[in-house]
């Protein structure tokens, strides 16, 4: 059974970094979503199969702007972790940019 043990060890060597990458992505999404909420973005849960299907058609974990009736609307879709859509306007987007810059400075301050 030495060959079987080698296969198991190899599978673990491959799987562990992938699990780590998923955890990092989940953590980054959580951090961004906390900033969006702090900036005043409204979280809308995809609490029906139809809403979740709509959410999955949007670019995942990207802040996207759209013009509606002459006003900008910003949205951030997370179909994987929170299964929700964050929505805000120019005021919330400006607050988000300020908070994100403050967080960047805090993290990279020597």
Regions found by a protein language model. Give the residues of each.
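Bacterial N-terminal signal peptides that target proteins for export
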Residues: 1-9
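Bacterial signal peptide processing site
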Residues: 22-25
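Compact soluble domain cores
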Residues: 33-53
């Amino acid at each position: 059974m030495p060959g079987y043990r080698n296969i198991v060890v190899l599978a673990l060597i491959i799987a562990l970094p992938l699990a780590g990458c998923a955890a990092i992505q989940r953590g980054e999404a959580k951090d961004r979503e906390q900033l969006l909420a702090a900036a005043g973005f409204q979280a809308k849960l995809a609490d029906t199969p139809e809403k979740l299907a709509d959410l999955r058609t949007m670019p995942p974990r990207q802040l996207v702007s759209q013009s509606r009736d002459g006003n900008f609307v910003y949205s951030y879709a997370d179909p994987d972790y929170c299964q929700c859509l964050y929505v805000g306007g120019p005021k919330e987007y400006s607050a988000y940019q300020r908070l994100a810059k403050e967080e960047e400075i805090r993290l990279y301050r020597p």
